[in-house]
Each structure stands twice: as C-alpha cells, then as structure tokens.
Amino acid sequence: MSNTSNFNERVTENAKPPKNVKSIIWKTIGIIIVMAIIIGLILFYVLPRNTIANISNIQYVDGNLVATATINGRSGRFILDLENSTYQTSYTSGLSLSISVFLRNLNNANGQSFFVSLIRPATSSANDAVFNIANLSINQTRGVATLVTEGGSYSAVLTTTLTALPLTGQKFLPEGFNLDTANTDAYRAAGAIPGIQRLLAVGNVQLPNQSTAILTQFLTSIIPFVILIVIYIVIARRFSRTMGAGGAIGEDGENVFTIGKSQAKLAKSTFKFTDVAGIEEEKSELIELVDYLKRPGKYVQMGARTPRGVVLYGPPGTGKTLLAKAVAGEAGVPFFQVTGSAFEDMLVGVGAKRVRNLFAKAKKAAPCIIFIDEIDSVGSKRGKYEISAGSATDQTLNQLLAEMDGFSTRTGIIVMAATNRLDVLDDALLRPGRFDRHIQVNLPDIKEREAILKIHSRNKNISSKVNLLDIARRTPGFSGAQLENVLNEATLLAVRADRTSISLTDIDEAIDRVIAGPAKKSRVISDFEKNQVAHHEAGHALVGLHLKGADEVQKITIIPRGQAGGYTLSTPKDAELNLKKKSDLLNMIAGALGGRASEELFFGKDAISTGASNDFYKATNIAKTMVTQLGMSDLGITQFLPSEGGINPNARYYSENTAQRIDEAIAKILEEQYQVAYNIIKDNQNELKLIVEALLIQETIVKNDIDYIHEHLKLPEAIIKLKEEQLKEKAAAEKEEQAEKAKLDHQSDSAQPQEEPTASTASSN
C-alpha cells in the first residue's frame, strides 16, 4: 500500500552491468601480447648469452694451434685453442663459426678463394672431426686440418715437425708457422708446400659461457611452461567472469568459484515514513526498531532485548517492501535486500553457504537490516510434502534458523521479511527470538486509499473536478500498487489525447483498465451477442439491487475488456471489514449466478452462453469454503480442509462418504442461491429490461443512472435524450443511404444503351 512516485530513482544499488564477451576476449589477447613482449625483453637482458669473438690471427703457441680473437662482448680478448677439447662438451651446441679462407696453390699461380662456414657442431668421438667447417675439417686427435676443394684434397699436419703423409696433394704447415710473419715465397722456393698459406679469420665465433650454461638451459626450458601457466590462469579467470556476467553460469558475475557467495544487494535507502501513506498502526510498530538502530545503548542499559526479526505479511502490493525501506531510510543504516529464491541453486548446500555469507557481511556492516522478500520460498514448513526431511531447502532453512538465533551471537542486525502467506512459514522461524513481531499489512480502507492517491498525485496535473475521495470510494479492494497504476494509466491516457491535465474520464477508463484490461471497442459484436451480454450484466446488477445487505452496484458496462464481454462493479455499503457474515457470502453467490439466471429466463436453456464461466468459479469457491472450512452448512462445524498452509493433493482428509456429503452440500448452496437470483429477475423483468435498454443506448451506466432506474422504473432524462439523438442519426443515415442507392440506380439506368427500332417497326409506323 505504501508507495512513492520515484521508487526506482531513489534507491542506488551496487549492481554491475554485464560485460561484453567480445571486449573481454580482445582485452585478454592484448594483455597476453603485452606480457609476451615484456617477458621477451627481460629474457634478452637477463639471460646469459654466448660471447661474440672476431678472429684476427691463427698461429702456433707453445706447440698448440690457437686463434687470437677480438671480443665484442663482455670478456675482452680471448684465446681460442683449436687443438684442445675445451669446447668439446655438451654445451657447445650453440657454437657457430664462419671463416673466410684464401688458398694459394703453387700449381695454381692465380690462386683460388673459398668461403666456408659451420655446418654442424663438434662431436666427442675420437675418430670424428672436432670442427667441420664446410669442406674444412680439423681433427684434434690426429692433428690434421684437411680442406677438400675442386682442385683436390689439401691437408696440413698440426704437429711440431714436418711430417710427410702418403696422401697425394698433401700440404704441410710447419711448427712455428705464423700467419702474420710467414715468408710464403721462401716456403715455395724450399719446396715446402704449405697447404694453407693464408687462413684469414674471419668471421664471428660465438663462445659459450660454460659457467652459466646450466642456468641458461634451465631457464630456457622452464620459462615457456611458466608463460603457458600464466596465460591459462588469465584466460580462465577472464572466461569465468565473462560467463558469470553473461548468465551462462550465474547472474551478477557469479561462477563456479563464487557460487556460494550471497546474492544480497546492498542498497542505501532514502525513504522516510512520510513517503508511506496509510498503515499508521503498522508504522508505529516499526518506530521502535528505528529507535533501536539509532540508539542501541538505551536498550542495553535497561536490559531489554530488541526484536531480532519482523515479518510483514499481507496481500500483494500493500507496501511491505516499502515499509522495510522506510525503516532503513529512517535509521540511516545499510540495507541488505535479497529474495528467498536467491539462496537456492543447482548445487546442494549452496543455500546454507549463502546464508552464512549473508550474515557474515551483515556483521561487518552492523548495525544494519537484512530484508528477505518472499521468504516463504525458503522458510516454508519443513517436511511438508517430501518423503525425506533432508532436502536442500530444509538445509537452507536450518542454517537461517541457526544464524537468527543460535550459539553465535549477533548484535545490531535486524532481519525483516515479507510474505503473502504467513500460514506456510515454519513454526520455528516464527517463534520469539527469531521473528518476534508479526505485522499484518492489509488492503487500504477508503481513508488510506485517499491518502495513497494524494501521495501519487503530487507530481501529476489533475483537474480540479476530480475528487480523490470519490476515486477512493470506487476502488474498494485496491492495493497501493493498483492505485498507483490507476493514476499512471490516467496520466498516459491524458498524454495520448494531448491534454495538459488528467480528467475524470481518464481516471474512469484507468480504473476499468486495472480491473478488466483495456477496452476492445474494435471487436465486432453482433446485435444478438450485444443484447445477450447486456441481459447477463443486468442480471448481476438486478440481483445486487434487490438483495438486502448486498454490495452497491457502482457501474455496469458491456464494452469488451480482456476476455470479458462486460462487467458489473459493486462495492461494500458499510465499513470495509474482512469479517463476512453467512448472509454476505450467500448474497455474493446469488449475485454471481444472476447473469446465468437472466440468460436462461430471457433466451431459454438452449441459448445460454459461456459468459458465466468465471461466475461459476467464484460461486463454487465461496460455497466450498463455507462447507469445508467455515462450518456454514448442514454438515456442522467440522473443518474438512485446513484453512492455513498448503493442501497436499495426495492427502486424504476425509472418507469417500464424507466427500460425497460435501459435494451435496456445495451443490445445495449453489442451487438455492441460483433459484434466489432467478426469482428476483423473474419478479423484476421490467426493471431489468430498462437496464438492458440503457446499456444498449449508452454501453456504460454508472451508479446515478442505476439508482434512478431502480427507484423510478424509467430511464433517466439524459439517456432518453441520447436515445432520441441516436434515432435521429439513424433515420438520417438511412435516408442518406436510400438517396445514395437511388442515385446509383439512376446512373446505372442512364448508362445502358437504347435499342434502335427494327425495320418492321418502322414500316408499321
């Protein structure tokens, strides 16, 4: 019932919008690329690398063939020992060598130039070459360097003495040979033929750092796996968040890793009790809670225990949720809002975990309010229909009971709940110490409806001719939400008609829309159907007019709305109390059956329509309640069906004989009240015909016209004038139609060609 005009605008929640899946994917790819670049740069500058050497000279030093290299790295100058196996280790796989060789042969005065480069790494076999540089082979075991060219095979023995080898074309390199100081001409003249006269260095040699080789191999082997693991974790986290935001696994970013977290939303409420109209008694019950949240020390000093829980129950739309928000707004404390169905999920045990998570959050934010809307979905009676009482819902309820009043103490937390069915809640949940106070929020009475209408009309331009009290009288049984909807629909109708203010006509149409839906004036209805609907609705109204203590007939219409061809609106005469007498219930049954009785009386049993289907449903339910729950039949005061809680369809509450007696008692009540309605209509046929005539003329008649017909047994002057105008318009339309038809006939005759006289006719003339 309690409402405000800007409900959605005044509550800010921390809900995050769902993320776009494509944007997440592209963002993830970008992060991976940036990480790869950063890791590559780190490896480039951190990992040990081979030294780059530039060979400048090759010579014998102390019986060993060595190369002098200029280092362009970290080590300065370095002596490359070609004969020793310094590099004959498992870490020489990265060694590469490029040498330019200039070979001059005495048999070839012009000389030849060759370029050779490393083709495979050295091996550890004694019979294999330590280095294989294209067609240049250096064997440290034999001490022989061999170069194979197109002109033949040239070998140099790397020993301390000149040794003649039995190989044709072998060339010898003597001990003490120095490339820089060697007199090549003297060697040629002496007949000593150096096989390699000039070995100019050249090229680049990568010298592996053996001390860091193990670390290098370890890092190069483990880092790729680390990168893959990091990428997998990033993608998995992004994917889980994306799936959660998209709803594939859960809502609000929920996924399998966070499914146990509470779905309660923390909202800061700005509602006040002044924004809540009516329900003054209910508000006074909650003032004490507000005072406790503001000044809890006062209650502690007096030794008082503040109510730990408050449950609000009543029909839908009466303002239970807004009352809770008003309490939070008045106290100025955090407000956790969650629905009862949000605790359960596809996994067993999730509900209990979410309850624990919710109260853990509340303890950190205390003092605060936890509001559970529709608590009956999680707090219904345990073991009601299930064979086993250990269902997942029962586990959630047990955890909720323990959190509300268990071994663990909680201070500053007030639990509020709302439900439409207090009778289905578990008794342990409703006991003192958990939900101490049970506050019923009923439908508003006429004064409360007027107050609600005033609140919702604050920001609306309503015509001065509109009386909100009259609207409140015409809307009995309306909840606060329905009243707000009436004014909103009226505003939309005024805007649609380009009016600057809301008129009484807009409000009348809005009330009809809320009750029966929008009018379907375009629906094609035959005169017979329209006449039958008028008799049906007039039957309802006539029975209500003649039954003592029945509700007042406020309005009758035969304009189709929704699935109904028309409807009759009745309101209570006296104060609107939930207490109903037996005579009131019987009058309601008779009024509901008046439509069918009128059809049968005026059209016969074979011409009755299906329009009474909903009437029978209402009448049967009332009669069934009277017999099985209220003790208002010949069967006595026995209650055959429970009036509280759900009814198990598989349970047997009575025997077959009793079931037959119940059916007979229900049928008896319906037959008796149908006969009452039939007799009233039969005795007042003239009055019913006047109501039918008024409906056929005006389609909708209100209380003033209905009361005038009932008291004077004639049509009101306004309806008579409308009838005369309709007759004149009809006569004028018929006259115009006849004139148009005659005109068309004349044009048709003039358009036909005349026959020429025949020869016989002419001669006779």
From Swiss-Prot:
Residues 1-27, 235-765 are cytoplasmic. The active site is at 537. GO terms for cellular component: plasma membrane. ATP binds at residues 314-321. Residues 730-765 are annotated as: Disordered. The keyword Nucleotide-binding applies. Residues 749-765 have a biased composition (Polar residues). CDD domains: RecA-like_FtsH. Its cofactor is Zn(2+). Residues 49-213 are extracellular. The chain crosses the membrane at residues 28-48, 214-234. Its main location: membrane. Residues 730-748 have a biased composition (Basic and acidic residues). PROSITE patterns: AAA (PS00674). It is found in: Cell membrane. Its EC number is 3.4.24.-. Keywords: ATP-binding, Cell membrane, Hydrolase, Membrane, Metal-binding, Metalloprotease, Nucleotide-binding, Protease, Transmembrane, Transmembrane helix, Zinc. The keyword Hydrolase applies. Binds 1 zinc ion per subunit. Homohexamer. In the central section; belongs to the AAA ATPase family. This is ATP-dependent zinc metalloprotease FtsH. It comes from Mycoplasmoides gallisepticum (strain R(high / passage 156)) (Mycoplasma gallisepticum). The lineage of its organism: Bacteria, Bacillati, Mycoplasmatota, Mycoplasmoidales, Mycoplasmoidaceae.
